[in-house]
Amino acid sequence: MQLTSFTDYGLRALIYMASLPEGRMTSISEVTEVYGVSRNHMVKIINQLSRMGYVTAVRGKNGGIRLGKPAGQIRVGDVVRDLEPLSLVNCSSEFCHITPACRLKQALAEAAQSFLKELDNYTLADLVEKNQPLYKLLLVE
């Protein structure tokens, strides 16, 4: 299973924010610079993450973006569920004539749920805490 770039960069943005020292704000420009992503694409991602409560945006001179809740409360599985369309196959009879008798859709749905359940075992804090190699790569030491 491959995540969409939207989900991939959403997770990366959250990882970056979770890696920052407590209380430090960042900007969309800073995140796009770190990952080399289009600013327009990242704006859409951050807006979606903000609507979902994962990111808080503060306007004004000293504004920026930061995690909307503690990193230890943000499960990776929840983020993927919220950002990723998880229909693995297009099972409409319009596209596939075996749809009425096919059991593949159910098997794939169960596999996707197992995947998400495993991701639920990890929070952003698990991914970033005491991860010096990550801090060095993100230049947040």
UniProtKB/Swiss-Prot annotation:
* Entry GO terms, CC: cytosol
Residues of the HTH rrf2-type domain: 2-129
Query: Which Gene Ontology BP annotations are present?
Result: negative regulation of DNA-templated transcription
Give the cofactor binding note.
Binds 1 [2Fe-2S] cluster per subunit.
Listed Pfam families: Rrf2
Q: Which cofactor does it need?
A: [2Fe-2S] cluster
State the source organism's domain of life. Bacteria
Keyword annotations of the record: 2Fe-2S, DNA-binding, Iron, Iron-sulfur, Metal-binding, Repressor, Transcription, Transcription regulation
Residue numbers binding [2Fe-2S] cluster: 91, 96, 102
**Known Gene3D superfamilies for this protein?**
Winged helix-like DNA-binding domain superfamily/Winged helix DNA-binding domain
Q: Which Gene Ontology molecular function entries are recorded, alphabetically?
A: 2 iron, 2 sulfur cluster binding; DNA-binding transcription factor activity; double-stranded DNA binding; iron ion binding
Under InterPro entries, the record lists: TR_Rrf2-type_CS, Tscrpt_reg_Rrf2, Tscrpt_rep_HTH_NsrR, WH-like_DNA-bd_sf, WH_DNA-bd_sf
Which sections of the sequence are annotated for DNA binding? 28-51
Q: Which PANTHER family does its entry note?
A: HTH-TYPE TRANSCRIPTIONAL REPRESSOR NSRR (PTHR33221:SF4), WINGED HELIX-TURN-HELIX TRANSCRIPTIONAL REGULATOR, RRF2 FAMILY (PTHR33221)
HAMAP family per the UniProt record, alphabetical: HTH_type_NsrR
Query: What's this protein's function?
Result: Nitric oxide-sensitive repressor of genes involved in protecting the cell against nitrosative stress. May require iron for activity.
Mind telling me which NCBIfam families this protein's record contains?
PRK11014.1, rrf2_super
Query: Could you identify this protein by its name?
Result: HTH-type transcriptional repressor NsrR
